[in-house]
Amino acid sequence: MMEDNKQLALRIDGAVQSASQEVTNLRAELTATNRRLAELSGGGGGPGSGPGAATSASAAAVTVADSAVATMENHQHGAQVLLREEVVQLQEEVHLLRQMKEMLAKDLEESQGGKCSEVLSATELRVQLVQKEQELARAKEALQAMKADRKRLKGEKTDLVSQMQQLYATLESREEQLRDFIRNYEQHRKESEDAVKALAKEKDLLEREKWELRRQAKEATDHAAALRSQLDLKDNRMKELEAELAMAKQSLATLTKDVPKRHSLAMPGETVLNGNQEWVVQADLPLTAAIRQSQQTLYHSHPPHPADRQVRVSPCHSRQPSVISDASAAEGDRSSTPSDINSPRHRTHSLCNGDSPGPVQKSLHNPIVQSLEDLEDQKRKKKKEKMGFGSISRVFARGKQRKSLDPGLFDDSDSQCSPTRHSLSLSEGEEQMDRLQHVELVRTTPMSHWKAGTVQAWLEVVMAMPMYVKACAENVKSGKVLLSLSDEDLELGLGVCSSLHRRKLRLAIEDYRDAEAGRSLSKAADLDHHWVAKAWLNDIGLSQYSQAFQNHLVDGRMLNSLMKRDLEKHLNVSKKFHQVSILLGIELLYQVNFSREALQERRARCETQNTDPVVWTNQRVLKWVRDIDLKEYADNLTNSGVHGAVLVLEPTFNAEAMATALGIPSGKHILRRHLAEEMSTIFHPSNSTGIRESERFGTPPGRASSITRAGREDSGGNSKHRAGRLPLGKIGRGFSSKEPDFHDDYGSLENEDCGDEDLQGRPEQCRLEGYGSLEVTNV
């Protein structure tokens, strides 16, 4: 806009200057014309020619003046837009004046030549001259008016320039303010970004602290649960010891008074034919320490019965034949673990296997009583309260005719001094022996031959389910009825509401059914729920779930049927990695055919050497981590579920996953590389091939190893074994991401069809399901 105003002002100035020049030129021409007219009039030209020329010149001058005045007037009333047109008009008038000048010049020439016919008089010339002078005066006034307009325009121009300068100044100030605002905004934005980053860092720190507190709370909860489970286990152990003490005292009373009857029970049982199968009493199970001591004290002076050294083989328990002797029995006592003592077979058979009876040595009675008194004194020191007899009555009462124990058995005085107490102890001993005979029939007689008492003894003692004995006594009268029971019958007839308890009974019944069909009882039957809850869960590093497994009575057969949904729904194993750890631990048991002896033998061989890592326990993995100079991180694997089967059988559990489980920071690349090198030397896939395909610890007939059976079907007709365990697929694409967040997508355990011919009645909800976002934790 300022540029347009400047250009307009320049054009106006140029037009005014050109008009001034034209007016000056016109004045000069008029002066020259007047002078020539005066010369003509003074020179005495013709009387007719002089006035005529003067008149024409005056007329021309008047015309020019009139036109100039008109032009000036138009210029005064015109606007700035009409200035250009006025300049053009002035130029045209100048052109006309020039033409008139030429005409006047021609007239002068004609007048000089005497061609003019008429000459104005001097008076007329004077009149015309006066008129011209007036016209000139008007022209001067017009010029002055034009000059005044020019001055006014210049003033307006100056005002416009000053206004433009003010606008420029205002604009510059606004621009400066805008720059200041932008500068302040940028600074404020940077400060806001810094504050947001600081808040984000603080938030991350608080999140880490929150998760750390949660982890610590979880650890504290797990530790409290583990302590609570240990306390419960100790209480249960105390009750079992009390029961065993009562059994020992009553057995002692029975042995001292009824040795011939004890001798008859120790003899090999008669054979029972069932088709081509022969059921023989197996006497290779160890006795409890107290009873073994009493028997050795009573019978040490007599030679063993010849039948004790014969080889006894039972189709129900297809074990390696063993020669029973006093030395081997003593060695069995020394090598037995607390879990072995607590097993159903040990508890139920400990009173049935002894040396050959002989005459009672009365002189040896006092040391036996003294040893029992020492045991009772130790028990009283641990628990100074009156011992309850509920568990003992449940174990040794028969049916609905339950009798109280003789209180004289727990007296420190000599039990032989009173005839009444002696007779009561004999009757109680007979009931105990009757119950033990029923338990003995459980392992020596097919289930279809069982009577009602044998079924009740099996349910109460072997299966550890005394809560269902009453309903069983009312509804189940024989083993054939037990074999024909369905899951609905178990729930309605026996009141078994727990699905896991029903499955435990179903698996046991099917196992005995297979034993009658010609196969032996599975070795998983030797793994009772005490061993699973105490020893096995501790070996795989998940002892925090011991109480749940104990409550649901999970034994070896149950382990072989557990699936992901069972772990999550019934056993409260919610973490995916813990579920995988348990399933891989079961897979290892499956590879060794659920042989506890074979597993312990392999673990003993690799205790001091870094070999056979597939059988490593969680404690052995911790020892290996300490041996490779990572002891500051070893404690993070406690109760983490990391054991040898996870390290070997799961190919996606690599060094990154192990480092994450150990809690090694991602920035410590040297430690992670060191761990990867150590793992590659121990857990290389080629090192475990022989372990997984070990011929020494083969799989049951009709089942291939879970590592090599992929893509093959079992055509041998063993539907139970074919559907008993589902193969484990890839658990995930990786365990090492913790950017949980450590939250990559992981794969899943493969689902396979359980088979329509599954005799174990595997429930639909127990089938293996997929795992999503599997996560390794060090909690």
UniProtKB/Swiss-Prot annotation:
GO terms for cellular component: cornified envelope; cytoskeleton; cytosol; desmosome; nuclear speck. The keyword Cytoplasm applies. Keywords: Cell junction, Coiled coil, Cytoplasm, Cytoskeleton, Keratinization, Nucleus, Phosphoprotein, Repeat. CDD domains: SAM_kazrin_repeat1, SAM_kazrin_repeat2, SAM_kazrin_repeat3. PROSITE patterns: SAM_DOMAIN. The keyword Glycoprotein does not apply. Residues 450-515, 528-592, 616-683 form the SAM domain. GO terms for biological process: keratinization. It is found in: Cell junction; Nucleus; Cytoplasm, Cytoskeleton. Pfam families: SAM_1, SAM_2. Residues 295-366, 403-429, 685-779 are annotated as: Disordered. Belongs to the kazrin family. Component of the cornified envelope of keratinocytes. May be involved in the interplay between adherens junctions and desmosomes. The function in the nucleus is not known. This is Kazrin. It comes from Mus musculus.
